[in-house]
UniProtKB/Swiss-Prot annotation:
<comment type="subunit">
    <text>PSII is composed of 1 copy each of membrane proteins PsbA, PsbB, PsbC, PsbD, PsbE, PsbF, PsbH, PsbI, PsbJ, PsbK, PsbL, PsbM, PsbT, PsbX, PsbY, PsbZ, Psb30/Ycf12, at least 3 peripheral proteins of the oxygen-evolving complex and a large number of cofactors. It forms dimeric complexes.</text>
</comment>
<keyword id="KW-0249">Electron transport</keyword>
<keyword id="KW-0408">Iron</keyword>
<keyword id="KW-0460">Magnesium</keyword>
<keyword id="KW-1133">Transmembrane helix</keyword>
<dbReference type="GO" id="GO:0009772">
    <property type="term" value="P:photosynthetic electron transport in photosystem II"/>
</dbReference>
<feature type="binding site">
    <location>
        <position position="213"/>
    </location>
    <ligand>
        <name>Fe cation</name>
    </ligand>
</feature>
<dbReference type="GO" id="GO:0005506">
    <property type="term" value="F:iron ion binding"/>
</dbReference>
<dbReference type="InterPro" id="IPR036854">
    <property type="entry name" value="Photo_II_D1/D2_sf"/>
</dbReference>
<feature type="transmembrane region" description="Helical">
    <location>
        <begin position="206"/>
        <end position="226"/>
    </location>
</feature>
<feature type="binding site" description="axial binding residue">
    <location>
        <position position="116"/>
    </location>
    <ligand>
        <name>chlorophyll a ChlzD2</name>
    </ligand>
</feature>
<feature type="binding site">
    <location>
        <position position="213"/>
    </location>
    <ligand>
        <name>a plastoquinone</name>
    </ligand>
</feature>
<keyword id="KW-0813">Transport</keyword>
<dbReference type="GO" id="GO:0045156">
    <property type="term" value="F:electron transporter, transferring electrons within the cyclic electron transport pathway of photosynthesis activity"/>
</dbReference>
<dbReference type="InterPro" id="IPR000484">
    <property type="entry name" value="Photo_RC_L/M"/>
</dbReference>
<keyword id="KW-0150">Chloroplast</keyword>
<keyword id="KW-0479">Metal-binding</keyword>
Length: 351
């Protein structure tokens, strides 16, 4: 028998808090939870409050709440008024001066949701890092989640920071996001931007890879269970392989002539494609924030202007973009009092 002689290690307040935060419970808290739960709760609560009660009349000249007759698709928490610039719009700041009603009217809820939402997403990413470390696995889930964080921060924070004010960010609502997409197309020709193309390829490519992978696994399952359905056919602690990688490799080698040789390369590729797509699209949005242009084929525009019989899909799209700008600006920015005479509005074969 071995007897260890020594003193108990002194445990401070930090150790006690650490033990409590990492205690095994139904919903893990952890140190990341101190950031995640309050910010996510406040962001979600702010959005539900805004879409239910708060008007956008004072910022956009629009009705945007359930109280005013909107539905789930048309309700939104709209961006602050253009005159607010890039103010954080703190409730106790010089704009609202502690008046909650006025704070809602000038768009304070949008800034509240955007900032708390960003920190909530970061907290969720840190949560995945923390749990991965405790469980003893690699942190690739957290690395993958950096993609959505990059998109959110670039679209809702960095883009309006590069523009005149928070007004030009997307409002938090379904139809409001669609309006923002039309704005990006009309004012930035976003669909022809190579970073947008890479983003689309990444997201749709990731969906395709996911569908192919799921179907292939289902096709090559080992039938070593006698249960009634797939979900009960295997035990959680089984030591055997669930599906045949060799059979899957043979199948796709016959289909395409090439196939993934091992599971590591296959699953890394499934991680790499969509995350890279998200990051490239986020980089593209930062470029739009700086008003950078991409793929302006001026020679085609000049020839189309000189030759009425020459038109390409590109020149047609440019004409459509001009229409979006001319007709959208007056509606989208009523505070500017834009007036476009009929003779300056674009006209062409497509309009």
């Amino acid at each position: 028998m071995t007897i260890a002689i020594g003193q108990n290690q002194e445990r401070g307040l930090f150790d006690l808090i650490d033990d409590w935060l990492k205690k095994d419970r139904f919903v893990f808290i952890g140190w990341s939870g101190l950031l995640l739960f309050p910010t996510a709760y406040l962001a979600a609560g702010g959005w539900m409050t805004g879409t239910t009660f708060v008007t956008s009349w004072y910022t956009h000249g629009l009705a945007s709440s359930y109280l005013e007759g909107c539905n789930f698709l048309t309700a939104a928490v709209s961006t602050p008024a253009n005159s607010m610039g890039h103010s954080l719009l703190l409730l106790w700041g010089p704009e609202a001066q502690g008046d909650f009603t006025r704070w809602c009217q000038i768009g304070g809820l949008w800034a509240f949701i955007a900032l708390h939402g960003a920190f909530g997403l970061i907290g969720f990413c840190l949560r995945q890092f923390e749990i991965a470390r405790l469980v003893g696995i690699r942190p690739y889930n957290a690395i993958a989640f950096s993609g959505p964080i990059a998109v959110f921060v670039s679209v809702f924070l960095l883009y309006p920071l590069g523009q005149a004010s928070w007004f030009f960010a997307p409002s938090f609502g379904v139809a409001a996001i669609f309006r923002f997409l039309l704005f990006l197309q009309g004012f930035h020709n976003w669909t022809l931007n190579p970073f947008h193309m890479m983003g689309v390829a990444g997201i749709l490519g990731g969906a395709l890879l996911c569908a192919i992978h799921g179907a292939t696994v289902e096709n090559t399952l080992f039938e070593d269970g006698d249960a009634a359905n797939t979900f009960r056919a295997f035990t959680p602690t089984q030591s055997e392989e669930t599906y045949s990688m060799v059979t899957a490799n043979r199948f796709w080698s016959q289909i395409f002539g090439v196939a993934f040789s091992n599971k590591r390369w296959l699953h890394f590729f499934m991680l790499f494609v969509p995350v890279t797509g998200l990051w490239t699209s986020a980089i593209g949005i930062v470029g739009l924030a700086l008003n950078l242009r991409a793929y302006d084929f001026v020679s085609q525009e000049l020839r189309a202007a000189e030759d009425p019989e020459f038109e390409t899909f590109y020149t047609k799209n440019i004409l459509l973009n001009e229409g979006i700008r001319a007709w959208m600006a007056a509606q989208d920015q009523p505070h500017e009092n834009f007036v476009f005479p009929e003779e300056v509005l674009p006209r062409g074969n497509a309009l």
